[in-house]
Amino acid sequence: QATRAELWSWRKTPEGRLAEIIVLDQFSRNIYRDQPESFAYDGLALALSQEAISLQLDAQLNPEQRSFLYMPFMHSESKLIHEFALKLFQRLGNEINLSFEKKHKVIIDRFGRYPHRNAILGRVSTPEETEFLLEPNSSF
């Protein structure tokens, strides 16, 4: 239902909206691990997160909840989105989450995408990406 945007009634509360985002952003990554579908709902999760922030619903959530609300920004392959993500995680004040965002942003700034997704998504890796993927901690 979430993948078809049928859970709009959940969006009546900040917690309900967060639940829908978690289903789209987190559940899909685990249910469809190593399959293209694991990233298929990233755009919808990001749009819902952006809208929640625009409506200032994040202010009604506790810091742990906000970290999950902001996760779709970290999963994006957009440099522009990562600029905003960095600000979100800095404002959140959790050093662990901020550290992870910085690591994600470095990869996006360098490649414009996450090379570890290439094989799953049927994308051809560049020689630089292939070399990067041989390094420790090159994927999440």
Where are each of the predicted segments found?
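Intrinsically disordered, low-complexity activation-like regions
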Residues: 1-34, 39-140
